[in-house]
Amino acid sequence: MKASELRKLSNEELKEKILELKKKLFNLRFQNKIGSISNTAEINQTKKDIARILTILRERELNKTNG
C-alpha cells in the first residue's frame, strides 16, 4: 500500500487499518512457524505497511501541535 493512498484516509480509518494489519501479521507469523506460508515476503511487507501508517499518524500529530 502506498503512502499517498494512506494519506487520503482519516485517522480513524488508519487506526482500523493498523488493527487489521496487526491481525494479518499475527496470522502470517503463525503460518510461517507451522510452515504453511508460501510467500514469506508478505510478512515484511505487512510490517512496512504498519510502519507507514504509524509514520503518517505521527506526522499528523506533530503538524497539529506545531501548526
Curated annotation (Swiss-Prot):
A Gene Ontology cellular component where this protein is annotated is: cytosolic large ribosomal subunit
Report the Gene3D superfamilies cross-referenced here: 1.10.287.310
**Swiss-Prot/TrEMBL keywords:** Ribonucleoprotein, Ribosomal protein
The cross-references to Pfam families, in alphabetical order and at most eight, read: Ribosomal_L29 (PF00831)
Task: List GO BP terms, alphabetically.
Answer: translation
GO terms, molecular function: structural constituent of ribosome
NCBIfam families (UniProt xref): L29
Q: Which family, according to UniProt?
A: Belongs to the universal ribosomal protein uL29 family.
Q: What is this protein called?
A: Large ribosomal subunit protein uL29
Species assigned in the record: Sulfurihydrogenibium sp. (strain YO3AOP1)
Q: What is the lineage of its organism?
A: Bacteria, Pseudomonadati, Aquificota, Aquificia, Aquificales
What gene codes for this chain? rpmC
